[in-house]
C-alpha cells in the first residue's frame, strides 16, 4: 500500500437499492418516508416498485449503514423516516 493514499471501500448494491438511494439523495435531499418516495418522486422506475419492495430495500440499505431511520409522524401514522448517512453524503464508499 502506498503512503498517503486512502482506498475507498466498495459496496455492491442491487439495481433497486441503487435506484432508491439515488432518488433519496437527488430528489429528497437525503431524507424521506417510504410512502413519500412513491407519491412525490418524478422517477418512473421507482413508481413501479411497491411500498413493500421499497421498505425491504431500505432495510437492506440500513443494514449496510448507508441509510439510517428514525420513527416520525407522517400523515397521522408513525413511520420510519430514512436518511442517508455520512458515508453517502461525503462519498466515503464507492457504489457498484
Task: Give the positions of each predicted feature.
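Short intrinsically disordered terminal tails
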Residues: 1, 94-96
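Short alpha-helical segments that sit at the start of domains
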Residues: 1-27, 31
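Alpha-helical hairpin
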Residues: 12-13, 49, 84
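Residues at alpha-helix boundaries and short interhelical turns
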Residues: 28, 45-48
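Short acidic, hydrophobic short linear motifs in intrinsically disordered regions
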Residues: 30-42
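Short amphipathic alpha-helical interaction segments
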Residues: 47-64
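A short, conserved structural fragment
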Residues: 62-72
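Short, cationic-aromatic polyanion-contact patches
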Residues: 72-94
Amino acid at each position: 500500500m502506498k503512503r498517503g493514499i486512502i482506498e475507498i471501500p466498495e459496496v455492491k448494491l442491487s439495481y433497486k437499492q441503487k435506484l432508491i438511494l439515488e432518488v433519496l439523495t437527488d430528489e429528497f435531499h437525503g431524507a424521506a418516508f417510504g410512502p413519500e418516495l412513491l407519491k412525490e418522486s418524478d422517477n418512473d422506475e421507482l413508481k413501479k416498485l411497491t411500498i413493500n419492495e421499497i421498505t425491504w430495500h431500505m432495510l437492506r440499505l440500513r443494514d449496510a449503514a448507508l441509510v439510517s431511520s428514525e420513527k416520525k409522524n407522517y400523515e397521522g401514522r408513525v413511520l420510519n423516516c430514512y436518511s442517508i448517512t455520512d458515508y453517502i453524503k461525503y462519498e466515503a464508499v464507492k457504489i457498484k
